[in-house]
Design a protein with these regions (language model features):
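A nucleotide- and high-energy phosphate-metabolite-utilizing enzyme signature
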Residues: 1-176
Length: 176
């Protein structure tokens, strides 16, 4: 398990500044000496991590969902990206459309869900002044307001917001 956490961190490495040839050499050595031929094991490890996360943090339809670790959350999207990157050596999720792994509408759903979930998570952190992942009842109302949701004649803003949340979480579940 720890080995695959480290592999995932290494998978995310990128050149920021310094010696570009050294960064290229690191990347080449990682792919040739560490990642090559281990895709099946990496996928199994990531799927097991997901299963354990879902057991611990619950289903997407929990009334107070975990936006990061829960089913249909950000970690599910990240896991899909990491698997794609490991198997196909992609740099962007959009590359999966060109590889015929995703249809363009699935890529669009991925992007919209990722943008929405990150916006929710950032609002949660901002409003609570700390890193918090559980979207509690009280926080749901505040996040809905902060994200511009308004009451309609038939429904409260928080209900509309949570319906959007569950719609995105369901799409993430469908994609992953």
């Amino acid at each position: 398990s720890e080995d695959y956490t480290i592999r995932t961190a290494m998978l995310e490495q990128r050149f920021v500044c310094g010696d570009i040839s050294l960064a290229s050499e690191l990347s080449e050595k990682l792919w040739n000496n560490l990642f090559e031929g281990t895709a099946k094991d990496f996928i199994s490890a990531k799927l097991k991590e997901r299963e354990n996360r879902h057991e611990k943090h619950g289903q997407r339809y929990m009334v107070e969902p975990n936006v990061k670790e829960g089913k249909g959350g950000l970690r599910d999207l990240q896991s899909l990206y990491w698997i794609a990157k490991y198997v196909y050596k992609t740099q962007r999720i959009s590359d999966l459309v060109e590889l015929n792994v995703f249809r363009s509408d699935e890529h669009e759903q991925f992007d919209k869900a990722e943008e929405f979930l990150w916006a929710v998570r950032c609002q949660m952190h901002h409003l609570s002044d700390r890193a918090i992942e559980q979207l509690s009842f009280d926080l749901q109302v505040e996040v809905a307001t902060a994200m511009g949701y308004k009451d309609s004649h038939a429904r409260r803003a928080v209900e509309i917001f949570m319906q959007d949340y569950f719609r995105h979480a369901t799409r993430v579940g469908d994609l992953t």
